[in-house]
Amino acid sequence: MSRDPILSLPWPDARPLPDTFFDRDALLVARELLGKVIRHRQGNLWLAARIIETEAYYLEEKGSHASLGYTEKRKALFLDGGHIYMYYARGGDSLNFSAGGPGNAVLIKSGHPWLDRISDHTALERMQSLNPDSQGRPREIGRLCAGQTLLCKAMGLKVPEWDAQRFDPQRLFVDDVGERPSQVIQAARLGIPKGRDEHLPYRFVDAAFAAFCTRNPLRRGQVAGRDYHLLGHQDPHLQ
């Protein structure tokens, strides 16, 4: 398979992100992935979710898997930008993409179902069947991909199939559909143990979808400038 997905488009106006998009600074990749759409083919259906929440990770900081050292299981983190790194988190699958520089990556923290002529309501129904609620009923759309393991479950993404692989535009890729968040929330990452760089503001959320992410950064009690920062489309992010 060619490394350039543009050479084998699944439909004429698909816009798969090239490897060069990912082979950049992890913070930049994490922010610019907001609004992009993950597409995964199951049979004749293209399941799709808009990326609404991401987290950046670096080799040299203590919150990353890569900081624990190279292993065969973590090898995707040390490959070129644009490799898929999947692992099990809290009993479910979790999706990451390697970024520029060995050990650096972006975690796809949550998404929101995406509907268009390619990924229609039949695809959405498949996603709901893959990720029902605790009673076995279709999960409401806003909560279907509201967390890293929920996202993978709804999208049918599995560690054994995709870990350490490259994107395949005929099966799995990230599509640039032209969506750009008008406002981005930057905050500290979630679930980082104390003493492992838990304070670093490496989490990005599409403000329009804050209510549908893993944990709403705009919930009651959170204070702008202390708990999070609001960034406009052109504003630089915090380092």
UniProtKB/Swiss-Prot annotation:
Q: Name one GO molecular function term.
A: DNA binding
Q: What is its EC number?
A: 3.2.2.-
Supply the InterPro entries for this chain: Formyl_transferase-like_C_sf, MPG, MPG_sf
Q: Which UniProt keywords apply?
A: DNA damage, DNA repair, Hydrolase
Q: Where in the sequence is the signal peptide annotated?
A: none
Which Pfam families does UniProt cross-reference here? Answer: Pur_DNA_glyco (PF02245)
Any one GO BP annotation for this protein? base-excision repair
Instruction: Note the HAMAP family from the entry.
Output: 3MGH
Q: Which family does it belong to?
A: Belongs to the DNA glycosylase MPG family.
Q: Can you name this protein?
A: Putative 3-methyladenine DNA glycosylase
**The species this protein was found in:** Pseudomonas aeruginosa (strain ATCC 15692 / DSM 22644 / CIP 104116 / JCM 14847 / LMG 12228 / 1C / PRS 101 / PAO1)
